[in-house]
Every structure is written in C-alpha cells, then in structure tokens.
C-alpha cells in the first residue's frame, strides 16, 4: 500500500500543536496503555511496553529541545519498533474486534509510532542512528497501518453481511406484512413515506456500538498516520458495494435511454413506480443512515472535509443513476395520462434534496435541474389537456342532451390533478418565473407592482391554469350545444354539463379552493339562466295557448276558438311528453327541480283554464274529444320527463 500525499497535511497539522502539550498527551497515552493492558499478560512484559513508550516520549522531547542533538538512542527506544512489530504479528493472528482492550492497546501503539515517525521527519536530524531507527519504525508503521486498513475493510464488510442476514431473517418472519405493504404500494401511485425516527433506527442496526467504536479508532489512527486517502478509499469502496447490493435486492438495475424510449407506457409505469419507491427509501432510510454512519466513523471536527467528501461521493454515485432514469423518462412522448407519474417523480426528487444537503452543492444543483425538467414536462403535459379540449370538435351531438364524455374526462382529470395542487402550483410558478425572465420587459412599470395590480395574479399560478381550462371547456360546450336543433334540448345539454361541473367542484375541496367562491356563484347563476331559458323555449307557447286573449267574440266565449286552444294544448303537450321523456337529466336533484318548476308553472295555469272554460264545451263526446287531460294527469306526465325512457301515454292513461 502506497502512502498518500496526505502525509504533508498531517505534518502541517502536527506543527500547529504545541510540543509540550503533545508530550503531555503522550504521557497520558502511556498511562492509559499501562492501565489497559490485560491482566493475563506477564508483569514484566507489561512494564516493558510502558517503559518503552515513556522512553520514546522522552527521546523525542530531548531531540526537539536540544540545539545540536547527538542522536544517541537508548536500548528502550531502540526496541520500540520491534515491540510494535510484535503487536502487529499478534493482531494479525487474532484480528481486531475480539477484545476491546487489546484493540485499544494496539491502536494506541500505532498512534504512538506514527507520531514518533512524523516528529522525527519534521526534525530532519542528520544522525545515522536516528535515520536507522526511523527507517525501522516507518516500516513497522506501514505494516501496522496495512493491517488496520485490512481490518477496517473486513469490519465494514462483516457488518454488511450481518445486515443482509438480519434483513433476510426479518423478511422471512414478516413476509405477510411485506406482501401487504407491496400490494398497498401498487394500489397507489403516491408512496407513503417512512417516519424519520423509524428510518434512523433501521439504518443503524447493522453496525453494533462496538463495531462503530473500532471503526472510529482505526479511521483516526490511519488519518493521523498520513493514510487518509487509503482509509477513505476502503470506506468508500465498501459502502458503494453495500449500496449496489441494496439497489439490486430491491430490483433497481437501471435502464438506459434507449430502453426507456422503446418500452410501452404500461411497462414504463412499473419502472417508474419502482424508481419512486427506491429513491424514497434512499431519502428516508439509506442516505440518512449513511450520513449517520459517516459522522460516527469520522467524528472529529478536523475530519469534516473527509465526511463531506465521502458522503458526497457515495450519494452522487447512486443519485446520478436515479437522475439518468428521470432524464430518460422526460424525453418520452408527452401525453396527458403521464402527468401524474411525472409529478410523482418531481415530488420524489424534491424530497431527496434534504437527504443530500450535507453533500457537495453541485449534486444538489443536478437534482434541482432534473426536477426542473420534470416540472417543465408536467407543464407541457398539462397543456395537452388544453389542446385536447380545443381539438374536440366532433359534429355529432350526445344523445338525449346527456353529459358529454369530454366534460367527464376533463373534470375527473382536474380532480385527480388537484390532489397534486401544491406541487402543480410550485411547478407552474417556477415555469412562469422562467418564462418571464426570458422575455424582455417593455413596460416601465415595475413587474411586481404590475402583477399586484392585476386581478389575475391575485390567484395562484395553478389556479390560473385551472380557470383557463374551465374557460376552454365552457367555450367548447357552448359550441357543442349548437349542434342540437331543438333549443330546449340545447339548454338541457348545457344544464347537464354545467351541473356535472358544479358538482365536481363542490365535491372536491381542492378544486373549490382553487376556483374560488365567486367562480362557483357565477356557475350557479349560469345554471339558473339555462333553466329559465329552457322553460321559456319549452313551455312558453304552451302557456300562450291558455291565455284568455282572443277567446271571446262580442263578449262571448267562441267555442271554435276554445276547441282549437284545447287541441293545440293537447298536441303540444303530447309532443313534449313524447320527446322529453327520452331526454336525460342525470343529476337526480336537478331532475326533481326541473319537474317541480314545470309543474308549478303549467299545472296552475292549466287548472285555471280547465276550470274556467270546460263548461263552455258540450258535455259528452265533445268534451272527451277536446279535453284530453285532467289537471292531475298533467302532473303525472310531467314526472315522466327526463328519464331517458319513452313512455306510452295511451298505456299510462
């Protein structure tokens, strides 16, 4: 293993410390070494190691203070490399992690020899004995750090294997719960995020406190010895491999741009759902857990740059794969049904940012850029809805004046879209800001003030889009209503569609909040106007034939005119009943309101006309010939209207 260039950095750090304070620290380490040596060791070897350590401290202190050091080395100091070398051999046989006390003794010895080597290199003494001792100590130090590096990697990998075993056991015991969770995820596009505290608890169970403590000591010893690059490389390789296994186990292999473009939307929907699930797991479990692990293994304040570099490297390698996939999805052909998956992906990347905020800013910018592209695609897709409304110009009217399929599709689409209200508002607001920034501003009035004065900008960006879609739908329905030759049916069509729209808005808190009360009141007013127009077109002429004007000639009721009036009423009412019983008013409340309003308009007028003029007709066959309906019959036949089923009057009578 080659020693890294970080040795120079370690030297600079050492120079910043006062020699006396470090010597005092060395004394303390020697005392700790003395007290922490296992009782099973012989008394002579215990004292020998402590004496050697103290002799080394004194030796370094002497060399540092004398102006012209002779470079004489005592037997105790001379034996120090060999003593550490023996510890290395012992640890190579037993390995770290078996005895915490022995681990501490070994790591303290490595720290001591590393500091000794670094101090002597700083002094640059021209002494053959010192040079010889330094060469031997350097060789032992390299061997010791190599062992630490090997143990470091082994401990990281062993913990990963234990994690896999624990996960497999958990999956075996909790299989039914897992199946339930998976089915729930498949039933809904929108994943349920895990609680943050649960995420942290799950993320750290694979490393025991003892393992964390040992990893921390090894990392500190390697970095102090000038082997920061080697330590970081081992850590990063192990954790990257762990992440690769994790992603493979949950089924994320990643597909390239060509694959995304080639597969059908149904298959791609499944890939997107898996992507969302995995990225959210990274956001809530894996990345926070990785940050916690990194902070635990490299806790020193001096290691902040190490922590950031390692965390950034790890999350970048994983996140770039996620962003490649989202970038490929953005390039697929746009269509309205894709909006909600795009918004799911947008939200997923938005929620990923807090999990990587401790990483390099460049990575965060990459995520934001990918998020922006998804947002722009969502805006374009939403625009497809507007295009579909404009282009729906069929010339065949919907039978019976029923709710048009375009109305149903648009309102259901908007209802679902409003479940993403906050996200869509954020998307459109960001899009409008970018569009405005890219356009020249010819007005001298400040743009913000202009917007504040504009009523349109008092609602949210997404609300403005909703209003625009509703205006387009209204205009399209108005055109479609003109396809009906019967003006009465035209107003039934407008009432049906208007009522459907209003009920959808009232049934959705999100849409109602976006559209506002004034818009809803305006829609209700339009419905009442359609209702009045229908009454005027359908029943105006019926009421006219029951008018008293023209019935009297020279002060007497003209029987021929009266008979004609009854005939006209019968014919008109028969035709209305025959025709409008086949029409559909799908909303039961509106159907009832229409029948009640017709009854209140027609029945009193007919009862009055019937009661006043029936006596002027000859009784018997003449009366039955011209008076076809009793007043109570009128109410019964009105109740047949708007059911969508033709009714035989003769059969009913």
From Swiss-Prot:
Molecular-function annotations in GO: phosphatidylinositol-4,5-bisphosphate binding
SUPFAM superfamilies recorded: Cullin repeat-like
Family affiliation: Belongs to the EXO70 family.
Entry GO CC: cytoplasm; exocyst; nucleus; pollen tube
Record-linked Pfam families: Exo70_C, Exo70_N
Gene3D superfamilies: Exocyst complex component Exo70
Primary localization class, coarse: cytoplasm
Subunit details: Interacts with ROH1A. Binds directly to B1L.
Region (Disordered): 1-50, 159-190, 432-456
Organism, scientific name: Arabidopsis thaliana (Mouse-ear cress)
Disruption of the gene: reported phenotype: Shorter roots, slow growing and reduced seed set. Slightly reduced male transmission and retarded pollen tube growth. Complete inactivation of pollen-specific transmission due to abnormal pollen tube growth in plants lacking both EXO70C1 and EXO70C2.
Post-translational modification, as annotated: Phosphorylated.
Tissue specificity annotation: Expressed in anthers, pollen and root trichoblast cells.
GO term, biological process aspect, one: regulation of pollen tube growth
Cellular location(s): Cytoplasm
Name of this chain's protein: Exocyst complex component EXO70C1
Residues in the signal sequence: none
InterPro entries: Cullin_repeat-like_dom_sf, Exo70, Exo70_C
Start-end of Basic and acidic residues biased regions: 1-34, 159-177, 438-451
Gene of this entry: EXO70C1
Keyword field: Cytoplasm, Developmental protein, Exocytosis, Phosphoprotein, Protein transport, Transport
Biological role: Required for global plant growth and for male transmission. Involved in the regulation of tip growth of pollen tube.
């Amino acid at each position: 293993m080659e020693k890294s260039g970080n040795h120079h950095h370690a030297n600079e750090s050492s120079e910043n410390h006062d020699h006396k304070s470090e010597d005092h620290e060395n004394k303390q380490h020697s005392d700790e070494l003395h007290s922490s040596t296992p009782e099973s060791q012989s008394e002579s070897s215990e004292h020998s190691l402590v004496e050697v350590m103290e002799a080394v401290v004194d030796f370094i202190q002497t060399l540092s203070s004398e102006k012209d050091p002779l470079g004489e080395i005592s037997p105790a100091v001379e034996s120090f490399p060999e003593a550490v070398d023996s510890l290395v051999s012992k640890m190579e046989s037993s390995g770290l992690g078996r005895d915490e006390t022995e681990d501490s003794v070994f790591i303290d010895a490595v720290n001591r020899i590393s500091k000794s080597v670094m101090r002597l290199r700083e002094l640059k003494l021209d002494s053959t004995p010192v040079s010889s001792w330094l060469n031997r100590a350097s060789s032992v130090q390299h061997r010791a750090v190599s062992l630490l590096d090997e143990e470091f990697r082994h401990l990281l990998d062993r913990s990963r294997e234990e994690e896999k075993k624990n996960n497999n056991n958990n999956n075996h015991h909790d299989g039914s719960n897992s199946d339930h969770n998976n089915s729930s995820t498949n039933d809904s596009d929108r994943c349920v995020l895990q609680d943050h505290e649960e995420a942290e608890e799950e993320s750290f169970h694979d490393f025991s406190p003892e393992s964390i403590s040992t990893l921390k000591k090894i990392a500190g010893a390697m970095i102090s010895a000038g082997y920061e690059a080697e330590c970081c490389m081992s850590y990063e390789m192990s954790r990257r491999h762990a992440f690769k296994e994790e992603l493979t186990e949950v089924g994320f292999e990643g597909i390239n741009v060509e694959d995304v473009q080639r597969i059908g939307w149904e298959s791609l929907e499944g890939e997107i759902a898996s992507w969302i699930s995995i990225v959210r797991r990274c956001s809530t479990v894996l990345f926070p857990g990785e940050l916690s692990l990194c902070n635990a293994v490299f806790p020193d304040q001096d290691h902040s740059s190490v922590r950031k570099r390692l965390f950034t490297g790890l999350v970048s390698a994983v996140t770039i794969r996620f962003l490649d996939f989202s970038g490929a999805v953005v390039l697929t052909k746009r269509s309205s049904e894709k909006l909600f998956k795009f918004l799911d992906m947008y939200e997923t990347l938005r929620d990923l940012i807090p999990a990587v905020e401790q990483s390099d800013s460049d990575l965060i910018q990459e995520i934001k850029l990918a998020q922006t592209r998804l947002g722009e695609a969502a805006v374009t897709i939403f625009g497809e809805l507007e295009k579909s409304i404009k282009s729906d110009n069929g010339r065949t009217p919907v039978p019976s004046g029923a709710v048009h399929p375009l109305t149903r599709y648009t309102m259901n689409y908007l209802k679902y879209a409003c479940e993403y209200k906050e996200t869509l508002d954020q998307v459109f607001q960001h899009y409008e800001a970018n569009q405005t920034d890219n356009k020249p501003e010819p007005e001298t009035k400040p743009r913000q003030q202009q917007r504040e004065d504009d009523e349109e900008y008092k609602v949210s960006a997404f609300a403005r889009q909703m209003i625009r879609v509703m205006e387009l739908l209204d205009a399209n329905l108005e055109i479609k209503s003109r396809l009906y030759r019967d003006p009465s049916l035209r107003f039934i069509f407008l009432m049906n569609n208007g009522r459907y729209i209003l009920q959808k808005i009232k049934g959705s808190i999100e849409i109602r909040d976006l559209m506002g009360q004034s818009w809803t009141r305006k829609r209700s007013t339009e419905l009442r106007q359609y209702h009045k127009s229908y009454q005027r077109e359908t029943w105006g002429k019926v009421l006219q034939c029951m008018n008293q004007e023209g019935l009297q000639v020279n002060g007497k009721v003209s029987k021929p005119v009266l008979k004609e009036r009854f005939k006209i009423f019968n014919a008109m009412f028969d035709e209305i009943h025959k025709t409008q019983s086949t029409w559909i008013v799908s909303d039961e409340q509106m159907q009832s309101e229409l029948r009640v309003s017709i009854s209140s308009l027609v029945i009193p007028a007919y009862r009055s006309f019937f009661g006043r003029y029936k006596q002027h007709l000859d009784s018997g066959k003449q009366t039955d010939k011209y008076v076809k309906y009793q007043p109570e019959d009128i109410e019964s036949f009105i109740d047949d209207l708007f059911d969508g089923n033709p009714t035989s009057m003769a059969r009913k009578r």
